[in-house]
């Protein structure tokens, strides 16, 4: 507990909240070639590396991860959700915020079913999250 004099001298600091997805809060003005402070829900980027990585301690798997260079010039790691994907180097993808708890440094998800990213094949439930189209009426009875 500070004394009254200490508070007069220093004062209290207001704690500023850090963003969970800082790359989505920077834009880039290509005409002026300057970074801007523009928040956006998603950003477009180009895959530079598509690889698998292993999760933290209690879990074991090969998680699919892509390194993406965004339109604002920042390069981030993004998780590729769902079973199977068609991404490779130079694929254009859309990323959204959302970390993967057991992969350190992965703070973004790739949006399936947009741009060069195909939706998950044969996905029947939670289709909108994986970019899967609605199956035809005849194919539903399986």
Swiss-Prot record:
Q: Which residues cross the membrane?
A: none
Instruction: Please give the PROSITE patterns that the UniProt record associates with this protein.
Output: RIBOSOMAL_S12
Role of this protein: With S4 and S5 plays an important role in translational accuracy.
Which keywords has UniProt assigned to this entry? Methylation, Ribonucleoprotein, Ribosomal protein, RNA-binding, rRNA-binding, tRNA-binding
Q: Modified residue 3-methylthioaspartic acid is at which positions?
A: 102
One GO term of the biological process aspect: translation
Question: What quaternary structure, including any partners, is listed in this protein's UniProt entry?
Answer: Part of the 30S ribosomal subunit. Contacts proteins S8 and S17. May interact with IF1 in the 30S initiation complex.
Could you tell me which species this protein originates from?
Ruminiclostridium cellulolyticum (strain ATCC 35319 / DSM 5812 / JCM 6584 / H10)
Q: Specify the superkingdom.
A: Bacteria
Family annotation (InterPro entries): NA-bd_OB-fold, Ribosomal_uS12, Ribosomal_uS12_bac
- Please provide, in alphabetical order, the Gene Ontology terms of the cellular component aspect for this entry: small ribosomal subunit
Give the residue ranges for region: Disordered: 1-43
Single GO molecular-function term?
tRNA binding
Q: Which Pfam families match?
A: Ribosom_S12_S23 (PF00164)
Report what the protein is called: Small ribosomal subunit protein uS12
For this chain, the family text in UniProt reads: Belongs to the universal ribosomal protein uS12 family.
